[in-house]
């Protein structure tokens, strides 16, 4: 059974919640949307009547120790009391199921309806802008803010006192300097120099920057064109004989050993002349070579034709002599039925040389 609260119910509910139930509501440091703190029954109905059926909230009861579940039905708002058991468990009055936390109770009745009306909890009713749970869940915020304000005010007061003291010290020093020489109309250089020296010793010295070297840019008129480097002399090749050059066996190449020109213009003209000469000479030599090749080909054909005729006649004579010797010394036994082996017979002497038997001393026989 729930214990009723005394006459001063708001303070009793506040002390009970802060001592026993604060850690049960917070889940991972987050306040659930359905928790609305200490609010009255009328305020809960005003919040739920403008919502559709199934909206709900849980509030701290004002008249007893425990919570109250308020939700919107189809035609009205219904309220169910939630008892807090000694082992810090929760149970709706009229039911037998026990829940370990209010989060479990809400999750269960989102799936299973509340008896005897068979109505489910759908959406948590959010607070409209008034946070009724701040005083319950964060009661030390006010004290902390007051302490912070006191500490800030004390720190500002000490800072102002220190600044006033420093200003008074500076003014007193100036007054002492002025009173030390009351008869002077103009300031003395000695006192000002001493004051500057004192200030320079108090302030940290800054490193003096090193002087920078300035490079003057040259105008384009002053810039002279770079001189061409002298060419390396290549080792002289073996001089070819004049006979080879005349016959066209060796190409005529001008000697590369030349005196280096004194000026870049002379060197360029010499390079152009050297590039043009070999081209002309090479064309002349190509024509000479073509003429010589044609004459040599005709001579080679005449010589080769005579030699070939001589070799052919000698070969035919040797073949004829060998064939005659073979016919005289060759004896063959003829079978009753002659068999054609595809080899020409010795009797066929009228056959050409290609179809006759080769001589015994012929190569490859």
UniProtKB/Swiss-Prot annotation:
Record GO biological process: signal transduction
Keyword terms: SH2 domain
Residues covered by the SH2 domain: 34-125
Highest taxon in the source lineage: Eukaryota
Composition skew (Polar residues), residue ranges: 257-277
Renumbered residue ranges of the record's region Disordered: 199-278, 335-365
GO annotation, cellular component aspect: cytoplasm
One Pfam assignment: SH2
PANTHER family xrefs: HEMATOPOIETIC SH2 DOMAIN-CONTAINING PROTEIN, T CELL-SPECIFIC ADAPTER PROTEIN TSAD
General function of this protein: May be an adapter protein involved in tyrosine kinase signaling.
Protein name: Hematopoietic SH2 domain-containing protein homolog
Organism: Danio rerio
Lineage of source species: Eukaryota, Metazoa, Chordata, Craniata, Vertebrata
Name of the gene this protein is made from: hsh2d
